[in-house]
Amino acid sequence: MAKTQAEINKRLDAYAKGTVDSPYRIKKATSYDPSFGVMEAGAIDADGYYHAQCQDLITDYVLWLTDNKVRTWGNAKDQIKQSYGTGFKIHENKPSTVPKKGWIAVFTSGSYQQWGHIGIVYDGGNTSTFTILEQNWNGYANKKPTKRVDNYYGLTHFIEIPVKAGTTVKKETAKKSASKTPAPKKKATLKVSKNHINYTMDKRGKKPEGMVIHNDAGRSSGQQYENSLANAGYARYANGIAHYYGSEGYVWEAIDAKNQIAWHTGDGTGANSGNFRFAGIEVCQSMSASDAQFLKNEQAVFQFTAEKFKEWGLTPNRKTVRLHMEFVPTACPHRSMVLHTGFNPVTQGRPSQAIMNKLKDYFIKQIKNYMDKGTSSSTVVKDGKTSSASTPATRPVTGSWKKNQYGTWYKPENATFVNGNQPIVTRIGSPFLNAPVGGNLPAGATIVYDEVCIQAGHIWIGYNAYNGDRVYCPVRTCQGVPPNHIPGVAWGVFK
């Protein structure tokens, strides 16, 4: 029997509060898969696998809507391939579509192409945004259904649910036919979002002394980082969070750097630490963007940094413009260093002070140009010579992946991984979830690895144990295959 709108609204509120009447609601902190976080009370785990995934919420919701007659199958993207029964209708997400409360939102394009993502419309919103109720947005599969404002990225379909006749439903209204994708902006225009994270950082008590310019070692844009991190919670932030994330035309202010610290330099929070003294900004997409696109992302960071330096009364110099590698052993900012000095810290090790100064001086010049002229242009180093950004550049930054007979993608990589706040089950001999268990990698443990693999929906690192065993440890989820794979949130910190 169809539910009334009032009943639907009550159900959604109960999901959000963690009090819904469901046999699949987690009653107390629970964990059976160390690949994910510990599920909190209120999380929905409808199938008993992989903790509280996004689809678990929909499986429970549809069972309730259909009086336990329809149980969904497949991943999130598969929901538009099946029928839930009478009264359910599948709609393509068009420019004129304003969803109604209770509808199911299905994401199948862009970064959601591999498995999809899914949630429930909590507030239909408008053309630009709506409020979604969802699970597993943070990748840890550990939270109860949570509300988040979404911008329609990757959303391809809505599933309309049946509503009992005679109830009041929010009327669909016409909206402008403008594309949900923001129109290209002028080069000098930056959109700055101040959608701060849902955690209060320690206060510095004074303005920052300067800016640390990072490379994100990821594939997301500034806006995508905002979507995934704004409500991620402490467990994710403890693995590292910067004040700002910049890409072409867009900067997300995750934390107000004027008086709050961030965890971006990895050297603690003491009065002399980089975390305490400096603001931090990530140049985004350092592992996925073309050289041309990455340079545009850098320009957004330089322009924004110039604005902040004016606000804070700072002059760009070697004391105020800093590199992550000045505080701890790391290759960051690896992509910028390759482009502007010709030195690759990933393959060549730690650079000399002269090379670091060369990169800092380039950053300083770019920031000064924006402060003095309001504009600047990129230059890169190619074959030892400086050239304009129009010079073709095709340097691979992700290494050469190979595929073995078992379908595992692998490549050599020498680095260090520091586990987060949850133990991880390791495997012996191969990167498969059904391989022999090697034990638990404790929370906070450090391992030095020499190989990276992609298999079974995860990214693994490989290393030799003291007893001679070859051990593989999953360190994040992964969608797709190289070179277009999309890594999930890391379960620790790479150095």
Curated annotation (Swiss-Prot):
The keyword Calcium applies. One of its GO terms (molecular function) is metal ion binding. It is an enzyme of class 3 (hydrolase). Residues 412-481 form the SH3b domain. It catalyses: Hydrolyzes the link between N-acetylmuramoyl residues and L-amino acid residues in certain cell-wall glycopeptides. Its cofactor is Zn(2+). Contains a cysteine-histidine dependent amido-hydrolase/peptidase domain (peptidase C51/CHAP domain) at the N-terminus, a central amidase domain and a SH3b cell wall-binding domain at the C-terminus. The CHAP domain contains a tightly bound structural Ca(2+) ion and it is present at the N-terminus and is associated with the endopeptidase activity. The SH3b domain increases the CHAP domain activity. Belongs to the N-acetylmuramoyl-L-alanine amidase 2 family. This is Endolysin LysGH15. The gene is lysGH15.
